[in-house]
From Swiss-Prot:
<protein>
    <recommendedName>
        <fullName>Uncharacterized protein At5g39570</fullName>
    </recommendedName>
</protein>
<dbReference type="GO" id="GO:0003729">
    <property type="term" value="F:mRNA binding"/>
</dbReference>
<feature type="compositionally biased region" description="Basic residues">
    <location>
        <begin position="364"/>
        <end position="374"/>
    </location>
</feature>
<feature type="modified residue" description="Phosphoserine">
    <location>
        <position position="339"/>
    </location>
</feature>
<feature type="region of interest" description="Disordered">
    <location>
        <begin position="36"/>
        <end position="381"/>
    </location>
</feature>
<dbReference type="InterPro" id="IPR038943">
    <property type="entry name" value="PLDrp1-like"/>
</dbReference>
<feature type="modified residue" description="Phosphoserine">
    <location>
        <position position="357"/>
    </location>
</feature>
<feature type="compositionally biased region" description="Basic and acidic residues">
    <location>
        <begin position="166"/>
        <end position="175"/>
    </location>
</feature>
<dbReference type="GO" id="GO:0005829">
    <property type="term" value="C:cytosol"/>
</dbReference>
<feature type="modified residue" description="Phosphoserine">
    <location>
        <position position="346"/>
    </location>
</feature>
<keyword id="KW-0597">Phosphoprotein</keyword>
<dbReference type="GO" id="GO:0070300">
    <property type="term" value="F:phosphatidic acid binding"/>
</dbReference>
<feature type="compositionally biased region" description="Acidic residues">
    <location>
        <begin position="9"/>
        <end position="18"/>
    </location>
</feature>
<feature type="region of interest" description="Disordered">
    <location>
        <begin position="1"/>
        <end position="20"/>
    </location>
</feature>
<dbReference type="GO" id="GO:0009536">
    <property type="term" value="C:plastid"/>
</dbReference>
<feature type="compositionally biased region" description="Basic and acidic residues">
    <location>
        <begin position="186"/>
        <end position="237"/>
    </location>
</feature>
């Protein structure tokens, strides 16, 4: 039994429920009446008939009142003091606090807060070399640096604490560069750039940072040599990945992947991957398993396992895949007549259960495969 047994429309299903407003609705004019048009009896006039000398800005609506902080005169004085400094208004008594009009000197009431940039009279910095509130970079007249390592000369600017450096401009020579505390450096070292393990004879001119490079490489601008020998370093060369140096001396060449050097001396050739030398004499398309007698002719379609007798002719119309030359025409006739021995598309393999009338084809294939294997062994040597 499902949990919800009621209809979805029964939203308010209790006993004393009148469904009339939900089903039929109600008319608001029937229940509340029609709205009456505006008239002088029911509506206020648009402009209030109050005299003009009545001030709405006053906090209390009386003709005689105390001068308010929100009055026009006080507001004008307050707002004009923000943009440009004016003398203090006469009617405001001098308040004994820090609150003063900005831009004027505060009366030294309580606290006498020293404005930043003014010279403090004498403020004793407490703590570990606590500094007085002066401008950074100015020399304080008297800074009594208490704590360990506090210095009392005038040259000591904020130099308290263990090995604290004097805060001077970097590049100037400080007056006394003997660092108080531990680890003070001498003054001549701050004029140099920090040398990370570089020797001083490398410091003479601008050089790129040498990470472990020898100094004879450091004489002129060179590209970083990662393990290249120095005779390769003389001119701009492309990176040689295992090529011998006499190949690099002859000029710009494409990278040779296992090509012999007598292949390198000719003009532009396509990269030969393991081809023998006599194949590379002229521009030849890549031969996939073709014999060398096939390579000597002009443009031919690629022969996949064709015999050499077929390759001696010119461009043939239909590529024969693994068939002999003598039984080419009668094989085509038999395939057109649909004799069942369809050797088309067999790609050099005999179908199972086919006729064994082409043993000479097997001999040719075996001889071609043996010749291809012998040439590949020669290339490996």
């Amino acid at each position: 039994m499902p949990y919800y047994t009621r209809d979805d429309n029964d939203v308010d299903d209790f006993d004393e429920f009148d469904p009339t407003p939900y089903s039929g609705g109600y008319d608001i004019t029937v229940i509340y009446g029609r709205p009456i048009p505006p008239s002088d009896e029911t509506c206020y006039p648009l402009s209030s008939g109050v005299d003009d000398d009545f001030e709405y800005e006053r906090p209390e609506f009386t003709q005689i009142h105390e001068p308010s902080a929100y009055g026009d005169e006080a507001l004008n004085t307050e707002y004009s003091s923000y943009s440009r400094p004016k003398p203090r208004p006469a009617f405001r008594p001098d308040s004994g606090g820090g609150g003063h009009v900005q831009g004027e000197r505060p009366n030294p009431g309580y606290g006498s807060e020293s404005g930043y940039g003014r010279k403090p009279e004498s403020e004793y910095g407490s703590g570990y070399g606590g500094q007085t509130e002066v401008e950074y970079g100015r020399r304080p007249e008297q800074s009594y640096g208490s704590g360990y390592g506090g210095r009392t000369e005038t040259e000591s600017e904020y130099g308290s604490g263990g090995g604290g450096r004097t805060e001077v401009e970097y590049g100037r020579r400080p007056e006394s560069g003997l660092g108080s505390g531990y680890g003070g450096r001498s003054e001549s070292e701050y004029e140099r750039k920090p040398s990370y393990g570089r020797s001083e004879e490398q410091e003479e001119g601008y050089r790129k940072p040498s990470y472990g490079r020898s100094e004879e490489q450091e004489e002129g601008y060179r590209k970083p040599s990662y393990g290249r020998s120095e005779e390769q370093e003389e001119g701009y060369r492309k990176p040689s990945y295992g090529r011998s140096e006499e190949e690099q001396e002859e000029g710009y060449r494409k990278p040779s992947y296992g090509r012999s050097e007598e292949q390198e001396e000719g003009s532009y050739r396509k990269p030969s991957y393991g081809r023998s030398d006599d194949q590379v004499e002229s521009y030849i398309k890549p031969s996939y398993g073709r014999s060398e007698e096939q390579e000597e002719g002009s443009y031919r379609k690629p022969s996949y396992g064709r015999s050499e007798e077929q390759e001696e002719g010119s461009y043939r119309k239909q590529p024969s895949y693994g068939r002999g030359n003598d039984d080419d025409d009668d094989e085509q006739r038999r395939n057109r007549s649909g004799s069942g021995d369809d050797e088309e598309g067999s790609y050099g393999r005999k179908k199972y259960g086919g006729n064994d009338s082409d043993e000479d084809e097997e001999k040719k294939k075996h001889r071609h495969k043996h010749h291809h294997q012998k040439r590949r062994d020669e290339d490996d040597e």
